[in-house]
Amino acid sequence: MTFSLNTKIIYPENGNDIKNAIILLHGYGGDGNDISALSLNWKRFLPNTIFLCPNGHEPCSINPVGFQWFDLSNDDSQYILEESIKAEKKLKLYINEIKKKYSLENSNICLSGFSQGCMMCINVGLTSDTDFNCVVGFSGKIINKENLSNKITSRTKMFLTHGDRDTVVSSIHLLEAKEFLLRNNVEVEIKMINNSDHHIPIEASSSALNYIKKNLII
């Protein structure tokens, strides 16, 4: 089966059965290969997990060798919202393909992403038919709180982490996301990483792994 998004796949080692999937979504201008680096540290602790790292559905407007989930070259909030909704639809189709291919349910799937990928994970995690196992997000935010609050259909629990010195996506968005999620009865844990800019430091990766291990049936 060919997926609708070009995907880097990391299979369980030693031919282990696939019981879980972690879908890793890259940031603006990145690609699936970039974000797949997380699997190098995680896979030995998650022996029955397949990692799927798709490229965004369109080339990045400012970095044509990379990809994006939605265009940021126009800073109009309504335009960004409309583009992100298009990406949501494509991701939901892609996730359904994964579920069919590997005989998985949402409860077997962790959504994880960095920056723009984190934003998409939050939206998909709250607008699906049933809860995913969890969302693990790095350095992201909620794209449009008013729009999202009006279409919540699921309440996937979340772990969100952010660098306190992030100069790309301000760390204030972590606190805003926590407040929004709690107000909408979504279980959330957060971790602010000291002296960290817009990347995924080892502390964030390790904390995220520990959270995933608590939630996935290994």
Where are the regions a protein language model picked out?
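Alpha/beta-hydrolase fold nucleophile elbow
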Residues: 103-113
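Short alpha-helix in the alpha/beta-hydrolase fold that links the catalytic acid
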Residues: 36-39, 170-180
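Short beta-strand/loop motif that positions the catalytic acidic residue
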Residues: 159-162, 166
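Conserved alpha/beta-hydrolase "nucleophile elbow" surrounding the catalytic nucleophile
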Residues: 26-28, 112-114, 163
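A conserved short beta-strand
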Residues: 130-142
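Serine-hydrolase catalytic machinery in alpha/beta-hydrolase-like enzymes
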Residues: 6-104
